[in-house]
């Protein structure tokens, strides 16, 4: 439009799979050469010169061994802080009163409902991107913390026990022995992305962002 004639080819390449593995770009470059130079405009952020490493891990058990907890569901995206979680419990009146008392004294937002399947506790938090979990409030982690203060490992099962012991409501990986940082990209973060426990299924997914100067083997 401006009448400028260049000697090189300028090409705008659009993709739609940034959040799902970028397979669209992989397919595109099977048929077209990589550009000699490229840049990616990304909203109104500043220029990015480094990106943390990403580890997205699933922890599961072969058998759901919880005796009191029948269901626990939270999270839909691995790269987000879950803003809602719920658990179903076969609880006594005494345990319910204790749970309510602890819920009132905590910084969480909990709702108690009585159903034919038992006590349902709903936890509400604040969503955030997994790379900045401290900017949100993890509803799943808060709910695990609440029930773990009342029930034993046998009653809540191995997955909830692991979350409570190894992470709880932390976002810096301290209890996992992973607290670290560098001057280039900052601190390692850990996000409890989802929990799914029902029937014989028991699993949790975590999103870890580690400093750019750190080897993935050090994290694993």
Role assignments for model-derived ranges:
Residues 1-64, 100, 104, 172-187:
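Acidic/histidine-rich catalytic neighborhood of metal-dependent amide-processing enzymes
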Residues 56, 62-220:
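Metal-dependent amide/peptide-bond hydrolase catalytic core
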